[in-house]
From Swiss-Prot:
Disulfide bonds: none annotated. Involved in protein export. Acts as a chaperone by maintaining the newly synthesized protein in an open conformation. Functions as a peptidyl-prolyl cis-trans isomerase. This is Trigger factor. It catalyses: [protein]-peptidylproline (omega=180) = [protein]-peptidylproline (omega=0). One of its GO terms (cellular component) is cytoplasm.
Length: 442
């Protein structure tokens, strides 16, 4: 068997394979003999029909089946020999073979996993946040929490500002046609302190109660509402109510004092531990995100189209399921995301992680997997039941194994990169806008 490979920069390669005619002829004859054994044709005893007649009657079907089998057989022999890892299904193309005396020629187009080397890890510089938590910081945090729990809102007759609580009705139109199923009444939220599209927040500012406002947006083609995907939709909003938060210093002071006194006697240490755990998680994610973002920049990869399609479909199905289960609002910002771009980033990270695991022979530590499961179980009322579920369910355990592997990869990278420590206060870390730091390592 002879083959010729044509390389393509975009992960789609083409191989041309020559199968000796003798192999094809022998396979055809063998197939015709098998058919003859099982077939009875008028005028001939079973198994005694001349091969030429069998060939005339069943030839086209047999040629098609035999060529298909041989094309697949020799292609998979080729990728096994060359140690090629393909993505998706290959596409076979037959050549005109009239002039070929010795070979039948065909080509196969196939996608391959991208080949790349992880570069410049030691040149990566990242910032590690260090927070020294003092008792007075914890008390301050408790005071803030106490005041949040007793927010009092009062109706106002003025222009809407950031952080006001508004109540609205809205309906939507496509080409001046009202889409009644999306009507929403008495929809309440705090301006600029929500997860809705910026157009909504921006339009409300400086408007008054009873104002009617309009804005138009183009819905993302990946939005869970199929009826709205890729369409220009006009929103009509009626402002029903505007409220501002009451700042009563005396009331807040009393509430804080009561809260702190109670907490100091009951579970002050628990609250402190929770704050420490939260900060540990925030700073760790911040560190990981910096490393991953720089790895992506320093190691560009051509993402194969098949992988991108599969990952985009996975994210789309996940979004649709979540949207329906939670009965989410069409204005939620996360559903106006370009899933293809998100899928590309996720695949980029996944390929880098897999490469680091392979190159450095990182393997699962079963003891650490068990410890992770135990840690997860402690968040539930019946930890032992949760541990048993993970023991019995191989898919769940595999998920934890992947998390443990990713943690090892991050530890490996943290040792390689240059870390610059930076001290933050508890206030700084609590007031930082962490929403802008997308969790990439997931």
């Amino acid at each position: 068997m002879k083959f010729f490979i044509e390389k393509n920069k975009k992960n789609t390669d083409r191989v041309t394979i020559n199968i000796p005619k003798k192999i094809v002829s022998n396979e055809l004859i063998r197939e015709f003999i098998e058919i003859n054994k099982k077939t009875k044709i008028n005028g001939f005893r079973k198994g005694k029909t001349p091969i030429k007649i069998i060939q005339e009657k069943y030839g086209n079907r047999v040629y098609y089946d035999v060529f298909n089998q041989l094309m697949q057989k020799f292609f998979y022999e080729f990728i096994k020999k060359e140690k090629i890892k393909i993505i998706g299904l290959p596409k076979y193309v037959m050549h005109e073979n009239e002039d070929q005396k010795e070979y039948f020629k065909y080509s196969v187009n196939y996608e391959v996993y991208p080949k790349f080397e992880i570069k410049d890890v030691n040149l990566i510089k990242v910032e590690k946040i260090i927070v020294n938590i003092k008792d007075e910081d914890v008390k301050k945090n408790i005071e803030k929490t106490a005041s949040y729990e007793k927010d009092i809102w009062n109706k106002v007759n003025r222009a809407i500002k950031t952080n006001d609580l508004v109540t609205i009705n809205y309906c939507i139109y496509e080409n001046n046609k009202k889409l009644d199923k999306f009507n929403v009444e008495k929809f309440k939220f705090i301006v600029s302190q929500n997860n809705f599209i910026p157009e909504l927040n921006n339009k409300l500012i400086n408007h008054f109660t009873n104002d009617v406002i309009f804005f138009k947006i183009n819905f993302c083609k990946f939005h869970p509402e199929e009826e709205l995907q890729g369409k220009d939709i006009t929103f009509k909003i009626k402002i029903l109510n505007v409220e501002e938060k009451q700042e009563n210093i005396e009331i807040e002071k009393n509430i804080k004092t009561i809260k702190i006194n109670k907490l100091s006697k009951l579970n002050y240490q628990t609250i402190k531990n929770n704050i420490i755990e939260k900060i540990k998680s925030l700073t760790q994610n911040h560190l990981q995100n910096q490393i991953i973002k720089q790895l992506i920049i320093k190691n560009p990869i051509n993402i194969p189209p098949t992988l991108l399609r599969e990952e985009t479909n996975f994210l789309r199905n996940k979004f649709i399921k979540e949207y329906k289960e939670k009965q989410e609002n069409i204005l939620k910002k996360k559903y106006h995301t370009n899933l293809e771009s998100k899928a590309k980033t996720r695949l980029h990270i996944k390929l880098i992680i897999e490469k680091i695991i392979r190159d450095n022979k990182i393997s699962v530590n079963e003891e650490k997997v068990d410890l992770l499961i135990k840690k997860i179980s402690l968040k539930y009322k019946k930890p032992l039941e949760i541990i048993n579920i993970y023991k019995k369910n191989t898919m769940l355990r595999k998920t934890i194994k992947n998390i443990e592997l990713e943690m090892q990869v991050m530890q490996f990278l943290i040792k390689k990169v240059k870390i610059i420590e930076k001290n933050w206060t508890l206030d700084e870390i609590m007031n930082y806008n962490w929403k802008n730091n997308e969790e990439l390592f997931a």
